[in-house]
Amino acid sequence: MPNIKSAIKRVEITKARTIRNASIKSAVKTAIRRYEEALAKADKEVAETALRNAMVAVDKAVTKGVLHKNAAARKKSRLTKRFNKIAG
């Protein structure tokens, strides 16, 4: 346990950020899971909406500093690729 006042504050900040980051990551995973479920049903319209929602979630994670922009680009590229397979 830290003894210095600034170190104590940093621990508190880290805990708060960890909680926030976990929440944002969870939102991204949930959006991607919903998209994958829509793909499994092969419903193009629902999948398109879910894809948009997943992309928004990924972009928000980048804005908040939770995901690196290249990791986000890779995720979005893979999601789009899978959509294009069923859209054919």
Swiss-Prot record:
UniProt cross-references to Pfam families, sorted A to Z: Ribosomal_S20p
Listed GO MF terms: small ribosomal subunit rRNA binding; structural constituent of ribosome
GO cellular component: cytosol; small ribosomal subunit
Annotated NCBIfam families: S20 (TIGR00029)
HAMAP family: Ribosomal_bS20
Functional note: Binds directly to 16S ribosomal RNA.
Name the record gives this protein: Small ribosomal subunit protein bS20
Encoding gene (name): rpsT
